[in-house]
Amino acid sequence: MIETDRIVGGQSLEEDMYVQPTVRPQIITDYIGQQAVREQLQLSINAAKMRQEHLDHVLLYGPPGLGKTTLSNIIAQEMGVTLRQTSGPVIEKPGDLAAILTRLEPHDVLFVDEIHRLSPIVEEVLYPAMEDFQIDIIIGEGPAAQSVKIDIPPFTLVGATTRAGLLTSPLRDRFGIVQRLEFYSIEELAQIVTRSANILGLSAEPDGALEIARRSRGTPRIANRLLRRVRDYAQVKGNGVITAEIADLALNLLEVDPLGLDKMDRRLLELLIQKFESRPVGIDSISAALGEERGTIEDVIEPFLVQQGFLIRTPRGRVVTQTAYRHLGLTMPERNLEDE
């Protein structure tokens, strides 16, 4: 998938795994942005600690790169317990889940990324574990098989997903705390860039941090990734200081424009304008013309374009807006202006 090649993609890249933990906040007061989510979690954590109970199960959903994994770490740190991490695709059989659950200590946090990808048979084991802190294990085979209930310690399940609509209702209803993570403001991202630069021992001027923030598509993971690229440019082409000019030159070299669009975003918009003459276009036609999978276009490329007002999803297909024409320096045909 193209997401693995995009510096402005929200999904985690291999390079992020080595650097991201060093800049990740460990306590909730260091976490920038998502004020409503922070306040709700802080309140729930404090209440659970006062009662000396486990925290209620937490579901975090929203676009990739907004801090779901970071929040799971913070929850465990604030509760003073161990964090166990896994993901939906890894838990293939009920036995895999049972092995994880039986190793938990009281009040531990179990973080399941991509929880929407759990299989139905695994979910069936998870339901009693979440509600009653028990799991049913089948011992034996055939007529001799019997179900045995095993008690497990009270724990907190933190589920993360970018596709909340794919969660089954029974699973979603078992989460006591459900929070959506929103895209970050430019000001919040500038704070994150400045904080990360300080941790990494970099010198970043406020205008330099702001320039990186503007092109980060509202996503901290992208902001930190762009910061590392600008750092390289500043050290090789400049004096090591990240200024607005250095950030602009570095990001232009990476083909990330002032609004955070990359060449794949522009390619999609130009395709709709030039090849399809701005008419409504179905997703399958776009997929064939771009040579990309439908899911990649829907989940990776389109969301940011829709959020920024460059693209509209209609029952008849995808339509490019006047905003997209202006951004690309093109004049919108009169018939399209009338349609808008």
UniProtKB/Swiss-Prot annotation:
One GO location term (cellular component): Holliday junction resolvase complex
Keyword Lipoprotein recorded: no
Q: Where is this region: Small ATPAse domain (RuvB-S)?
A: 185-255
Identify the keywords attached in UniProt to this record, alphabetized: ATP-binding, Cytoplasm, DNA damage, DNA recombination, DNA repair, DNA-binding, Hydrolase, Nucleotide-binding
**Compartment(s) of residence:** Cytoplasm
Q: Which InterPro entries match?
A: AAA+_ATPase, AAA_lid_4, DNA_helicase_Holl-junc_RuvB, P-loop_NTPase, RuvB-like_N, RuvB_C, WH-like_DNA-bd_sf, WH_DNA-bd_sf
Superkingdom of the source?
A: Bacteria
What chemistry does it catalyse, as a reaction equation?
A: ATP + H2O = ADP + phosphate + H(+)
Region of interest: Large ATPase domain (RuvB-L) = 4-184
Q: Which residues bind DNA?
A: 294, 313, 318
Domain remarks in the entry? Has 3 domains, the large (RuvB-L) and small ATPase (RuvB-S) domains and the C-terminal head (RuvB-H) domain. The head domain binds DNA, while the ATPase domains jointly bind ATP, ADP or are empty depending on the state of the subunit in the translocation cycle. During a single DNA translocation step the structure of each domain remains the same, but their relative positions change.
Briefly state the protein's biological role: The RuvA-RuvB-RuvC complex processes Holliday junction (HJ) DNA during genetic recombination and DNA repair, while the RuvA-RuvB complex plays an important role in the rescue of blocked DNA replication forks via replication fork reversal (RFR). RuvA specifically binds to HJ cruciform DNA, conferring on it an open structure. The RuvB hexamer acts as an ATP-dependent pump, pulling dsDNA into and through the RuvAB complex. RuvB forms 2 homohexamers on either side of HJ DNA bound by 1 or 2 RuvA tetramers; 4 subunits per hexamer contact DNA at a time.
Family to which the UniProt record says this protein belongs: Belongs to the RuvB family.
Name assigned to this protein: Holliday junction branch migration complex subunit RuvB
Q: Which organism is it from?
A: Hydrogenovibrio crunogenus (strain DSM 25203 / XCL-2)
